[in-house]
């Protein structure tokens, strides 16, 4: 099975309140940077053949050095991201399309992951890739723990309460067969359409495509705010403890 992964890692961490536009991927958790954890997970995933990373221009060389020094041989390209996350992914897909044309080999699946989700596990990546290749699309998600309500007629009041049993919190990596993901992004670029995730684009342009759910644990958080760092430390410690028990 051949899988190609895209990692979107251009976030500057405004909500992290980092100085000088520092990338949140360079925050350390458990003695390693966030992006190190993410790179390692994809390096260790048996299904993944090549990884394309989009990041800030001043993070390209540090990321390349990190990959070299740690033997992350699956990191194929590290390029400058675009203005929006979707633009960054499109930049990576342009390179993937070129590779497909030159090699004549079509991947079984393309995965798109947030660089700031460092606790994804290699075996989870492999399973999402497998389901994506078999069914066309797969997205990891968790059941919400809290009750969710609509905002009412003004931001100061609530509207109706949503049925929590029918809700899922969506995460990454999101996986798709290459043809549909590439075409969805191509059409979105032509139409000037932006979405918050890749699944939304596939839903829009291929409504007949069912997107399969991979139910994820609560460890696969996105490092977004300062409070996420100590939570991440605890998650990492828990993951290490479980692995040592096995």
Swiss-Prot record:
GO terms for biological process: isopentenyl diphosphate biosynthetic process, methylerythritol 4-phosphate pathway. Keywords: Isoprene biosynthesis, Nucleotidyltransferase, Transferase. It comes from Chlorobaculum parvum (strain DSM 263 / NCIMB 8327) (Chlorobium vibrioforme subsp. thiosulfatophilum). PROSITE patterns: ISPD (PS01295). Pathway: Isoprenoid biosynthesis; isopentenyl diphosphate biosynthesis via DXP pathway; isopentenyl diphosphate from 1-deoxy-D-xylulose 5-phosphate: step 2/6. One of its GO terms (molecular function) is 2-C-methyl-D-erythritol 4-phosphate cytidylyltransferase activity. Signal peptide: none annotated. Catalyzes the formation of 4-diphosphocytidyl-2-C-methyl-D-erythritol from CTP and 2-C-methyl-D-erythritol 4-phosphate (MEP). The record marks 15, 24 as: Transition state stabilizer. Its EC number is 2.7.7.60. Belongs to the IspD/TarI cytidylyltransferase family. IspD subfamily. It is an enzyme of class 2 (transferase). It catalyses: 2-C-methyl-D-erythritol 4-phosphate + CTP + H(+) = 4-CDP-2-C-methyl-D-erythritol + diphosphate. The record marks 164, 222 as: Positions MEP for the nucleophilic attack. The keyword Membrane does not apply. This is 2-C-methyl-D-erythritol 4-phosphate cytidylyltransferase. The keyword Coiled coil does not apply. The lineage of its organism: Bacteria, Pseudomonadati, Chlorobiota, Chlorobiia, Chlorobiales.
